[in-house]
Amino acid sequence: MDLLKFKKNKLHINNIKLEYILKKRQTPFYLYSLNQIRKNIKQIKSSFKKFDPLICYAIKANSNLSILKELRKNNLGADVVSLGELKLALKAGIKPNKIVFSGVGKTDEEIKFAIKKNILSINA
């Protein structure tokens, strides 16, 4: 299935007419394709399956809680760079042993919280 497609000169996203979507939402808004997200996850996991890696999604790329929950359902981890992102990953249900705390300039509070939650690693 194509994500974007014209049918009878009308743009469709996931086979839904864009005009219909626009009638249901105020603009501007973000529109995500859950089908495409799942397809991307499957492709990435398939590409690396022989190595059995922990694939961590960088929460700074998109912190939408619904998307993060979908990542959790697909057994992905999280790469976080702040206390807020760490709390969001945990709120999404991502297991602490699948959370990597990257970035520089971590506060004592952030480090203590990460240790208390027993996350996988804290990178300096």
Where are these regions (language model features)?
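A charged N-terminal "starter" segment
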Residues: 1-121
